[in-house]
């Protein structure tokens, strides 16, 4: 389609300055109609807004205002996986529901910032215009995280702690001790653990002979808590195995197959999430391994109650409440606070 440029007359751009000139008031008065309404009489503000609406002016440029004042009225949520992950993972769906509900109540916007971007190569600068960040169990050495810390912006961490910043978490080590001691009490001595990666791109199987290291504090806390419980009960950790993988049911199934094929003496699979546990039970069902008679399986989060007709033994936590408190801490001016939420070992048929 060809546009006739002779008829393409540009409409003059409406600004606060031009609006003020038309109304015969100051630039500041017009600005206050949107940004500081308490400084104007209701009648004057209504007069300005009504005229602005009549001529199609929606108000000051929010981006320009954010750049000028340093206040974007937006918080960023950073997580390890791709953007679509938070709309698929049950834990993160509940977490984001809590975050979003508090943002709505405070009239604050949200920006979702994934650390894993499939098309990205090299180091990308952090360009999001936000007032502060919620870090959702992130890899701490990621370039984006280091940029945030270097800028000194407001931060609240979820399921791990940074010195000088507020956090929200359950006692993850205590939760894993609960699971480990429960399984030990059932007589298990050969364990496999299915976990998300200890650091970016570290995947596969390894022994628990040595403490696990990396930069995903949540994963390290949970796995090493299990290892500590095993050692305290004279379990041979050289015959206990860890499988690190991508976080979903399919990879949980693959991990269970790899662990039980390579080490058929394993009698209990400890999964760091219910999603992993779903996959593990699916594999056991497919391989003809009775759960829990031949292989016990535990999860984490209490979001998958039953798999293949088997109730899942797991740790219950309130992810939605975690998100709500994170926003409250981020928007508050109070001192650094570490908020610990309750957790519960929920015993069902799988272990």
Describe every region a protein language model picked out.
Residues 81-94, 113-118, 168-178, 193-231, ...:
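Hinge/beta->alpha junction and helix N-cap segments in small-molecule ligand-binding domains
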Residues 2-14, 53-87, 106:
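N-terminal helix-turn-helix/winged-helix DNA-binding helices
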Residues 253-351:
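Flexible loop/turn connectors
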Residues 130-136, 192-194, 242, 263-273, ...:
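Periplasmic-binding protein-like
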Residues 189-190, 237-240, 291-296:
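Short acidic capping loops at alpha-helix termini that bridge into adjacent secondary structure
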Residues 120-174:
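Short beta-strand-centered segments that line the small-molecule binding cleft or hinge
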Residues 19-20, 48, 295, 345:
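Append "Primarily bacterial transcriptional regulators
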């Amino acid at each position: 389609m060809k546009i006739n440029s002779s008829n393409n007359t540009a409409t003059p751009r409406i600004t606060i300055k031009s609006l003020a000139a038309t109304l015969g008031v100051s630039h500041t008065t017009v600005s206050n109609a949107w940004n500081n309404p308490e400084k104007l009489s209701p009648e004057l503000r209504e007069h300005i807004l009504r005229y602005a609406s009549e001529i199609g002016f929606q108000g000051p440029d929010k981006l320009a205002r954010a750049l000028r004042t340093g206040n974007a009225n937006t918080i960023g949520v950073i997580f390890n996986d791709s953007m679509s992950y938070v709309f698929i993972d049950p834990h993160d769906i509940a977490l984001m529901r809590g975050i979003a509900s508090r943002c709505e109540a405070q009239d604050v916007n949200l920006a979702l910032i994934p650390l894993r971007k499939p098309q990205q190569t090299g180091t990308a600068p952090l360009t999001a215009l936000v007032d502060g960040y919620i870090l959702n169990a992130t890899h701490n050495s990621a370039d984006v995280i280091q940029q945030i810390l270097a800028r000194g912006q407001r931060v609240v961490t979820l399921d791990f702690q940074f010195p000088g910043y507020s956090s929200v978490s359950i006692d993850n080590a205590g939760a894993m001790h609960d699971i480990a001691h429960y399984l030990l009490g059932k007589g298990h001595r050969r364990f496999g653990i299915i976990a998300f990666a200890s650091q970016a791109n570290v995947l596969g199987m390894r022994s628990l002979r040595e403490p696990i290291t990396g930069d995903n504090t949540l994963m390290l806390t949970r796995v090493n808590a299990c290892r500590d419980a095993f050692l305290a009960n004279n379990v041979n950790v050289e015959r206990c195995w860890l499988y690190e993988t991508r976080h979903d049911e399919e990879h949980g199934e693959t991990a269970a197959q790899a662990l039980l094929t390579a080490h058929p003496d394993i009698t209990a699979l400890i999964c760091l999430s219910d999603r992993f546990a779903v996959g593990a039970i699916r594999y056991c069902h497919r391989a003809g391994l009775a759960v829990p008679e031949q292989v016990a399986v535990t999860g984490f989060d209490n979001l998958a109650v039953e798999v293949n007709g088997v109730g899942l033994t797991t740790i219950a936590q309130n992810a939605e409440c975690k998100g709500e408190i994170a926003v409250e801490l981020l928007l508050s001016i109070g001192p650094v606070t570490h908020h610990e939420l309750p957790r519960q070992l929920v015993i069902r048929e799988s272990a």
